[in-house]
């Protein structure tokens, strides 16, 4: 069975919480470095590598130019789990007018998280559940 994650942004601690969604929905949170925070040089990536940072423990297909696995990657608002939507289809509809599908990764990393942090994102994705796939997960930094 595919893993499901509940993703929430805790703006007070500047942490993106990724928790297993199910009977026991408690799990570790994975901190995302703040834009201006200073970290030790041994653990922080160089500025040139910053654009390649994975978003938590998401499947490798999530950052591909073609998007995540179409058949098993879904999202839904936590309160209305009966109305899940395919994340690739949802994103494709939002992407109409964008010149290239190669903008998938920058859109997710920059636009989606920026809107999320500013509180101006579509409420359907402010708290959402992502269905996993069979691809290997990207490693955490």
From Swiss-Prot:
Pfam families: X (PF00739)
Chief localisation class: host cell
Region of interest called Mitochondrial targeting sequence, as start-end residue ranges on this chain: 68-113
Region (Disordered) location: 24-52
Keyword Magnesium found: no
Keyword annotations from UniProtKB, A to Z: Activation of host NF-kappa-B by virus, Activator, Apoptosis, Host cytoplasm, Host G2/M cell cycle arrest by virus, Host mitochondrion, Host nucleus, Host-virus interaction, Modulation of host cell cycle by virus, Transcription, Transcription regulation
The protein, known as: Protein X
Lineage, uppermost ranks: Viruses, Riboviria, Pararnavirae, Artverviricota, Revtraviricetes
């Amino acid at each position: 069975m595919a893993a499901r994650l509940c993703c929430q942004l805790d703006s007070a601690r500047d942490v993106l919480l990724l928790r297993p969604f199910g009977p026991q929905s408690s799990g570790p949170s994975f901190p995302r470095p703040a834009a201006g925070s200073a970290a030790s040089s041994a653990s922080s990536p160089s500025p040139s590598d910053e654009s390649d940072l994975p978003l938590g423990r998401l499947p490798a297909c999530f950052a591909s130019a073609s998007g995540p696995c179409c058949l098993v990657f879904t999202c839904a608002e936590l309160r209305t789990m009966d109305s899940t939507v395919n994340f690739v289809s949802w994103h494709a509809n939002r992407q109409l007018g964008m010149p290239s599908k190669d903008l998938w990764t920058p859109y997710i990393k920059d636009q989606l998280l920026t809107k999320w942090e500013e509180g101006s994102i579509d409420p359907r994705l402010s708290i959402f559940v992502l269905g996993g796939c069979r691809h290997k997960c990207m490693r955490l930094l």
